[in-house]
Amino acid sequence: WADSVLATLSVRPKAAQMVWVWTLGDYTAVDAPQYVTIEKQIADLELGGIIVSVGGPMDIATKVNALQRASKLPLMVGADLETGAAFRARGGWFLPNAIELGGATSFPYQMGIGATRDPKLAYEMGRVTAEEGRAMGIHMAFAPVLDVNNNPKNPVISARSFGEDAKLVGEMGTALVKGIQEHGMLATGKHFPGHGDTEQNSHLELSKVNVSRARLDS
């Protein structure tokens, strides 16, 4: 199906399929400026996907479904799900009776899972993440973190990593990827080789890997 559709597209919509737009996952009125802008971008530019941020599970699913309807082609939907679907799907309150609504399963940061030394638990984390994320219409998890946390001065990786041992990171990361991908969701290993040995916060500035090739390969 994908090949047959791709063959019908000109260069511009092909390029647009590589562009994703970010959106909050919270409830948004259909005439709210933020929502109208994103809906128009998707419909007019034929964008390929959306990156969903924080919102309640029902709100995320509702917004994803609405944007899917606005798109000429099915959208890919991704989200940062490093500690499970709860990394983006938060709970809330239903009025007037103030009944607490659940969000999604929240797991420890990966260092907590790595401390168990049990790949089966990492697999189960992936399974639950995929099942809950797919229920909200999310296709791709921007997880797991596969950086090796081997620099105590690193300000941004820390507990997001499985640990400082490359073998452990590989084993636990492989299990988590399998748990995600064997249950209908795509996984994304991140961030890049050596990022666990940098000293910059990559959310704020460009991280630099100031080590030799031999250290990278070790």
Located regions from the model:
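Alpha-helical scaffolding within the catalytic cores
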Residues: 1-6, 33-37, 218
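Enzymes and membrane/adaptor proteins characterized by extended Gly/Ser/Thr/Asp/Glu-rich
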Residues: 24-172, 191, 196-212
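Proline-centered turn/helix-capping motifs that create local helix->coil transitions or kinks
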Residues: 180, 184-186, 196-197
